[in-house]
């Protein structure tokens, strides 16, 4: 059995930066000062194995500013948080360490600038995703969220307001382009389009498409709560390539690959290298 591993599999820049910031806090407490409690506001990334490792090191997770004690070090998750929540955390007397992905922060800034001009946001994203909740907080002139073209077509969008289009940073680029063309046809040149999908996401999705076309079966590794990982699995399904989405190598068995000569391996942006390496090791043993 031949194995092909995606070069883009594993941590993206934003995840890597966030985890390095958290690791620095754990490994280098202030000299001659009592250790401060360290918490993340929401899961710092969407990977249960990483979260378990940090929990074992004493890093807590909070989801409500009211639960934060004064003096606590609060690390903002890579997905970002709503602006009012950030202010509420500061009001609790916490020390804030911002680990928001730079690409997410740029999207927040771009959306805020458009909203200040009175434009209404049309956001392509998962309504319940933490990144989306954060982005919406900057759309102070109004917003509509939709997860796909079907949901968009059902929205009541009168021609009075001036709209602008943006996307969750990990959304599907090809679907976004279809949505852009549909909205331009509907609203004309008055529609402002923001480029907020991360380049790393686009590259990862393109490589997954190429890999799906070159293999008989594709293994996608990453947390089941990870939106970008789920979209990689969707790429394989759209290509008609048999696939499986797993979190760890423990979910594999030789019988899954009976009759397949070439296996592809890719992983989401929040999947640690050691987990991908272990999956590769197990696959190569079959």
UniProtKB/Swiss-Prot annotation:
According to the UniProt entry, where is the signal peptide?
Answer: none
* Cofactor binding, note field: Binds 1 [4Fe-4S] cluster per subunit.
Q: Which GO biological-process labels does this protein carry?
A: dimethylallyl diphosphate biosynthetic process; isopentenyl diphosphate biosynthetic process, methylerythritol 4-phosphate pathway; terpenoid biosynthetic process
Provide the residue positions that the database annotates as binding dimethylallyl diphosphate.
46, 79, 129, 226, 228, 270
Does the record's keyword annotation contain Membrane? no
| Binding locations of (2E)-4-hydroxy-3-methylbut-2-enyl diphosphate | 46, 79, 129, 169, 226, 228, 270
Quote the catalytic residue positions.
131 (proton donor)
Q: What is its EC number?
A: 1.17.7.4
Return the CDD domains for the record. lytB_ispH (cd13944)
Pathways per UniProt: Isoprenoid biosynthesis; dimethylallyl diphosphate biosynthesis; dimethylallyl diphosphate from (2E)-4-hydroxy-3-methylbutenyl diphosphate: step 1/1; Isoprenoid biosynthesis; isopentenyl diphosphate biosynthesis via DXP pathway; isopentenyl diphosphate from 1-deoxy-D-xylulose 5-phosphate: step 6/6
The cofactors named for this UniProt entry are: [4Fe-4S] cluster
Against PANTHER family, the record matches this protein to:
4-HYDROXY-3-METHYLBUT-2-ENYL DIPHOSPHATE REDUCTASE
Q: Belongs to which family?
A: Belongs to the IspH family.
Protein known as: 4-hydroxy-3-methylbut-2-enyl diphosphate reductase
